[in-house]
Design a protein with these regions (language model features):
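Surface-exposed, charged secondary-structure patches
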Residues: 70-110
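Core segments of small alpha/beta cavity-forming domains
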Residues: 2-85
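Residue-level marker of positions within ordered structural domains that often coincide
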Residues: 51, 103, 137
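Aromatic-enriched hydrophobic runs in primary sequence
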Residues: 24, 46, 55, 61, ...
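Short beta-strand edge/turn micro-motifs at domain boundaries
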Residues: 1-11, 93-97, 107-150
């Protein structure tokens, strides 16, 4: 069973304030990287940042986009906030849920460059909740994206 920890207790149970800040810096970098690479259809550069389930979901979405001849245009403007919402621990596995608020310009076009959705001239505020996981026994300090919600 997972042990749930309130956000205020997170720093005391897992790591100190400095490590928490470092985690959020890394989470922000991962968030931007994953969004931009997925939008470009390139999973090679993010394979080490996402678990197999997420990789398979992203790969399927990219395949479907290509089959339909759809093109995405995404410009990542920035992250307004990234807040740790929940921490769970089971045995040696840590899971951290982060709520991101970002600004992105995006649109989806068909083969003829007609806009199907989005607006290439408008900044959109995006709310995402992502869950990251890490095995504390691992010598690899990286966290994996294991779930996304928006």
């Amino acid at each position: 069973m997972f042990k749930k920890t309130r956000t205020k207790d997170f720093k005391n149970e897992v790591f100190g304030e400095e490590a928490k800040k470092d985690f959020l810096i890394g989470a922000k970098i991962a968030y931007e990287t994953i969004i931009t690479e997925f939008a470009s259809g390139n999973l090679k550069n993010i394979k080490s940042l996402i678990d197999k389930k997420i990789y398979d979901q992203f790969n399927q979405a990219i395949r479907e986009r290509k089959e339909k001849g759809h093109l995405t245009e995404t410009n990542f403007v920035g992250i307004n906030s990234a807040v740790i919402k929940e921490h769970e621990k089971k045995d040696n596995i840590l899971e951290v849920t982060v709520e991101f608020v970002s600004e992105i310009i995006s649109c989806l076009r068909d083969r003829n460059k007609k806009i199907l959705s989005g607006d290439p001239g408008k900044i959109k505020k995006v709310h995402d909740t992502w869950k990251f996981s890490r095995d504390v026994r691992s010598t690899n300090p990286s966290w994996l994206l294991i779930d996304t919600q928006n």
